[in-house]
């Protein structure tokens, strides 16, 4: 009987959050280990389905770096990276688009649908969802001067047209977006999935942006998880070296989304089963929340 009472208490803890977020939009960036482990794939699918059933409009943006790397290797194509961005020539872009839209997107849609949801896959080219311009990288030369580097078909999202997402949501579908955008001349662009999630969240005036990662969240210099960070404190955390390396672009993605109107952003460990539900529907959460 005590176990049943504890289950009821868990549901009651979630109730105020369900009431608060019903009818709102949450955008989730899905990637990392959560995509590779069968048990985590199922828990992710069930989390997303539950959100939809309780009235939360859920949009998924997925990555696919490991799958792209594997396919490029099979084709004998060697990738170069500039400041963490893959140099994407026309041949590489063809492989990237094939993997993201033809393989990974279908897989994500498939396991949501197989577990009782109604997902619909699309890329940023569908309905001109993600309009891009070429992203140029500024790098420092050995002599200290700054040089602009063309890294190929890597896109900077300059416009989001969310009508197709709104139509899918009204139809009861969970949109699943592959991070491939389109240029003004119809050319395809490879886009960072975190950036896509942030831009889409802003365009939909989302309540939350959630980035699933392979780390527990933002940590202090002593290694302790920072469960909540005010937006105004983020620049200092970067300047003093608390936020470093690959966490910087993720945190920047969150702050950009908040500045554009998203209410809260979360960096959550996707290696934990039901990480999304634990972050949203519990009093403490399990990751890092950044709030305006």
Swiss-Prot record:
Coiled-coil annotated spans: none
Chemical reaction(s) catalysed: N-acetyl-L-glutamate + ATP = N-acetyl-L-glutamyl 5-phosphate + ADP
InterPro entries on file: AceGlu_kinase-like_sf, AcgluKinase_fam, ArgB, Asp/Glu/Uridylate_kinase, Glu/AcGlu_kinase, NAGK-C
Residues that bind substrate: 64-65, 86, 190
Function text: Catalyzes the ATP-dependent phosphorylation of N-acetyl-L-glutamate.
Pathway annotation: Amino-acid biosynthesis; L-arginine biosynthesis; N(2)-acetyl-L-ornithine from L-glutamate: step 2/4
A GO MF label: acetylglutamate kinase activity
PANTHER family referenced in this protein's UniProt entry, alphabetically: N-ACETYLGLUTAMATE SYNTHASE, N-ACETYLGLUTAMATE SYNTHASE, MITOCHONDRIAL
Positions marked as site (Transition state stabilizer): 29, 250
Secretion signal span: none
UniProt subcellular location: Cytoplasm
Pfam families: AA_kinase
Protein family according to the UniProt entry: Belongs to the acetylglutamate kinase family. ArgB subfamily.
GO biological process annotation, one example: arginine biosynthetic process via ornithine
Protein's name in the database: Acetylglutamate kinase
Enzyme Commission no: 2.7.2.8
Transmembrane segments: none
Cellular component GO terms held in the UniProt record: cytoplasm
């Amino acid at each position: 009987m005590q176990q049943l009472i504890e289950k009821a208490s868990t549901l009651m803890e979630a109730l105020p959050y369900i009431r608060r977020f019903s009818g709102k939009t949450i955008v989730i960036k899905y990637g990392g280990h959560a995509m590779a482990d069968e048990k985590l794939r199922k828990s992710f699918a069930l989390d997303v389905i539950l959100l939809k059933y309780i009235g939360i409009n859920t949009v998924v943006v997925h990555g696919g770096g490991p799958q792209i790397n594997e396919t490029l290797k099979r084709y004998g194509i060697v990738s170069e990276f500039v400041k963490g961005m893959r140099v994407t020539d026309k041949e590489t872009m063809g492989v990237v688009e094939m993997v993201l839209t033809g393989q990974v997107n279908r897989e994500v849609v498939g396991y949501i649908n197989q577990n009782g949801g109604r997902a619909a896959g699309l890329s940023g080219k569908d309905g001109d969802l993600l309009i891009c311009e070429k992203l140029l990288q500024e790098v420092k030369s050995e002599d200290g001067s700054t040089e602009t580097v063309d890294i190929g078909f890597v896109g900077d999202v300059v416009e989001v047209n969310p009508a197709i997402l709104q139509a899918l949501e009204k139809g009861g579908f969970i949109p699943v977006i592959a991070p491939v955008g389109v240029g003004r001349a119809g050319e395809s662009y490879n886009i960072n999935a975190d950036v896509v999630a942030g831009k889409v969240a802003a365009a939909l005036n989302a309540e939350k942006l959630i980035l699933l990662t392979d780390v527990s969240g933002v940590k202090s210099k002593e290694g302790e998880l920072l469960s909540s960070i005010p937006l105004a404190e983020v620049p200092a955390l970067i300047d003093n070296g608390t936020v470093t390396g690959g966490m910087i672009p993720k945190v920047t993605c969150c702050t950009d989304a908040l500045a554009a109107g998203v209410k809260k952003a979360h960096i959550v460990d996707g290696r934990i089963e039901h990480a999304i539900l634990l972050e949203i529907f519990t009093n403490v959460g399990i990751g890092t929340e950044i709030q305006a």
